[in-house]
């Protein structure tokens, strides 16, 4: 396996000049910015001493407010106050509303179906809102460090797809900030712990944030970070704990309907109770309705644990799958790193310790560890540590492939392949004289295109007319360090080519992310059987087309009995191929092959005779 050097080659033009770069953890609930100063990476505080910036933006007639200033209005002005915008990045409006129809926002759809938040200050999409969260972090960094930034490393969940990653980069570009790299959040945590603790061996990164869950299995060895496997859920996080408790309280208080402000106030109170229960055995939840009615209820740890148990079990199931993908057993995991504020919940730590058989690492603040790792990476990428031997091997979470005849998937880049990566594979034409080829790029683990996610389509035109199977089309998949995919197809004899960069309009739906891997395992046997059937059906179609063309050209070489035998074999194959018996199709192909052997020999003899016609022995 090739190891990928992340440090930029060569020395700086001014080798003793420290270049300013930071790491930004753009989180669902809170965001942080960190930098390396005097060789130590740490998060940067604002003027009030707060390190975390609430990922909340309020748009009013008076302007834009970000952080705690906006958060104060989240209950009383929910229509104009956007929280957890990271959950909306790269997703369609229809997908968002299907997931939660009770969101307290006034939405409209853009031309391509993406969500627009209608506020007093105008319409804003998730990219613009994310840029407004990034702006105070960049300003804080430049003020603290005393200069302009040369670049930033922004962290994203490992399960973010191309659209979500591209949206994150575009948010930074709106500010004129250079993105040195998008870094997976679990990998950033590994960088922080790998350098600070000097760990070597297999480590699990359990990252439970406000809106996403990621599990990564990494092998650390002498500065090399190799990601063995990743998994998780882009729609599961601490916010879901809040929603579970809020739903319980609403039912207990028999509140059949709430206004948008009351609903937001209930979620805020649920979060407060959740956080208090990390230190206390019980907490009193309280909600004051707009009519002045006050509801109160004591919530103890056992009640809260019962509400979130199923959600925590989902994360453990993802851990189990990731270990299986990495071919690692529980006892081979030396340490488990806890990342994200939601890992402070006692039940989460109990279940993680129970699964891995050891207490998880929490020596670095789980809220700040990702930003710290990103800062270390930014310091290397900007050229402050050209001698660094830090190597980072990231992976793609789902296989990438192309559709072939019969609706089959030919995987070009397998799941858990390290990135950046380039893979090439050759394909050919199916019909004589074919001058164009349509390509369908898909993502997923299933054997049939219908069961995978469509990413993009493009067409290669101008292929020189040739016999079926004679053209050689080389298809290259390239995945860059940010997980963005480009696909190029080139016909080798003519050099004609076409390419596409895959930037899907929408992100993966919650259902797709949660079920794609499980479905691939649950349907593995069935999928293989369906693939074998489809392959035989494609081969049957190829044989029938080839024989039909041969009969049209050289049918006069056969007598009536021979022609009738072949025609009968073709009719039998066509009839069998329309059914679902793989073995029967294979036998029918073999029978037709036997029946047409003499015809093939006669065609060969005829071709040789025509080629030698008029030639002398000396010429031969």
Curated annotation (Swiss-Prot):
Give the protein's biological function: Chaperone involved in the maturation of iron-sulfur cluster-containing proteins. Has a low intrinsic ATPase activity which is markedly stimulated by HscB.
Which keywords does this Swiss-Prot/TrEMBL entry list? ATP-binding, Chaperone, Nucleotide-binding
PANTHER family named among the record's database cross-references: HEAT SHOCK PROTEIN 70KDA
Pfam families recorded for this chain? Answer: HSP70
Q: Which domain of life is it from?
A: Bacteria
Which PROSITE patterns did the record assign?
A: HSP70_1, HSP70_2
- SUPFAM superfamilies in the record: Actin-like ATPase domain (SSF53067), Heat shock protein 70kD (HSP70), C-terminal subdomain (SSF100934), Heat shock protein 70kD (HSP70), peptide-binding domain (SSF100920)
Q: Which GO terms describe its biological process?
A: iron-sulfur cluster assembly
Q: Does the keyword Magnesium apply?
A: no
Family of the protein in this entry: Belongs to the heat shock protein 70 family.
**Name by which UniProt lists this protein:** Chaperone protein HscA homolog
Q: What residue stretch is flagged as signal peptide?
A: none
Q: Which GO terms describe its molecular function?
A: ATP binding; ATP hydrolysis activity; ATP-dependent protein folding chaperone; unfolded protein binding
Under the heading InterPro entries, the entry gives: ATPase_NBD, Heat_shock_70_CS, HSP70_C_sf, HSP70_peptide-bd_sf, Hsp_70_fam, ISC_FeS_clus_asmbl_HscA
